[in-house]
């Protein structure tokens, strides 16, 4: 075990046993607020990921949909006769419309059935397009998880330097020139590392991070609902 590792362990134990009141080394402006927000966003990544996954799969429903699948005569082509497919709710509605379109070729029900079928088949396709966009955001969340690991290491470094510097400044030992020089170096490193960590946390929170993911998810859902509404307007 090298000296730095031993020092890190000793510092970690000391920080846990003795709560330090930082009177000599304040955090840089905005750091504390950004860190609090960052930790909340970081700890919510799974919730966001789960909500996106739900948006991607809700159309497959639960027991009601499974019951509908078992009762429907899903024959859309000769090649599919006798085959079972796990249709989504939009495809299932489209197939219902297709069945109605076969009842009396000249009837108004037939025409409505065709329009109904087309609308829901189109919506099913739009849903796949939305899912493709949402899949990109799930990948982004995975990247953010990796990014958070790097940020946490930098936050730990900030915490360690701050502790060492606070102890150095509070030391009652006479300051030799080398000690003053070391203290100045530590202070410079603390400020530089803090700025780097703050920048990365703000990026994680902002449009390049979690906020951007939420915006993209909302945009994908909006596009889907707008296209779906337009398709349904044709069923008259």
Curated annotation (Swiss-Prot):
**Superkingdom as given in the UniProt entry:** Eukaryota
- According to the record, the residues making up region (Disordered) are 169-188
Tell me where it mainly resides: other
Name one matching Pfam family.
BAR_2
Q: Where in the cell is it found?
A: Spore wall
Q: Which family does it belong to?
A: Belongs to the SWP12 family.
| InterPro entries given in the database record | AH/BAR_dom_sf, BAR_dom-cont
A GO CC annotation given for this chain = spore wall
Which species?
A: Encephalitozoon cuniculi (strain GB-M1) (Microsporidian parasite)
Q: What is this protein called?
A: Spore wall protein 12
